[in-house]
Amino acid sequence: YILTKAFAYKVNAAKFPHADGEIKVAIIGSGPAGLGCSDVLNQLGFKVTVFERDDRPGGLLMYGVPNIKLPKEILLAKIKGLEEAGVQFCLNTNVGIDISWSAIREQYAAVVICTGSSQPRPLKLPGNELAGIHYAKDFLTSTTKGLLDHQLTPGTFLSAEGKDVLIIGGGDTGADCAALALSHGAHSILQAELQDCNMARISQEGFCELVKGDVSLQYNTKVKRLLGDDKGNVSGAELCRVEWGHTDSGMPVAKEIEETTLVLPVQMVLLALGFSGPEPVVFEKFGVKKTPLGTIANVSGSFLAAEPGVFAAGDARRGGGMVAWAFDEGWDAALECAKYLTAK
C-alpha cells in the first residue's frame, strides 16, 4: 500500500545522476531490489544496465502482483522515470543463458545480483501429476501478461471462471490468487493453510482481500491427496483438519484429527507454497554459493556475494519477504557497491 502511494505521488521518482560517469555496473533482475539498486547507483553517476529475462521490467512487481493490488501504470511510470534518468534495461535476456557470466564480468566493473527468490516449492502429495495444478506465480503472470498484451481471451491465460478452485498456502500470494480467481468468476474458492492463524504469514491487507470476497480461508487444514478423472485432470481433493502439538524435542508437529476427512470437488489447484530460493542457473553460472536456506551466501555483514565486485541483494540474498524490504536491500547494496568502486 505504501509503495503504491509512493509511486502514485512520485515520492520515489528517479533523479538524474550527479555526474555522467563511465564506470559500468550490471544489475541482474529488475524486481524491487533491482529497481532500488539501479536508482541509487544511477544517481551516484554510474552507468547502469539492468538485465531482465522477461519481456517487461519490474520482476515480481510486474507479473507477480495482480493489478488490483498494484496498478501497472504506476509501476511503468516509475520505470519510465528511471529510463529517462539514464538507466538502461536489457529485456528478454537471461544472464547465464542468453549472455554468459564471463561476458558480464568482462564488460562491467561490478555486478549486483537481484534475481529474487523465484524457485517455487513443489507439491509433495499423491496426485501432483494431474493436469489443472499450477504454481501461483504462473497463474498470476498469465492474467497480468494477457491484460498488458491486450490478449485476455479464452484459452490464452489460466482462467478460473466457473471452476472450484483450491489454493494451497495461506500467505499473501495465496490471497492474491484468491482475489484474482474471484475476479475471473470462479464457482468456489477454498484457501487451505496447514498452520494455524497465529503461524500463517498473511498481512492485514491480504486478509481483508479474502474477507471482502467469497473466499473460504481454512487454517489447520491439510490437503492429503488430489483426485483425478479418467482424462488425467484434477477433479477433487481430500482434506482433513489438524491440531498442532510438539515432538519430544520441542519441534511443532501437525496431527490429523480423526473423522474430519472430506472430499471436495476441485477443477483447479493453485500452489502458493512459497519459494525455496533463486533458480538453479544463479548457482550454476554466477559463481556464488548457496546457504542451507537456499539463498545466495554473502560475506557476513556485507552484500558481497562472491569474488570482489559481485554483490547480491533482495530476496535472492535474504529470502522471501516484503517488497519494501527488497527495495531497502537494493538501496543498501548500491551504496556498498559504490563504495567498492570508488575505493577501487
What are these regions (language model features)?
Residues 91-105, 220-233, 245:
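A conserved short coil-to-beta-strand element within the FAD-binding core of flavoproteins
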Residues 109, 186-187, 308:
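A short helix->loop->beta-strand "cap" motif at the edges of active sites that frequently abuts
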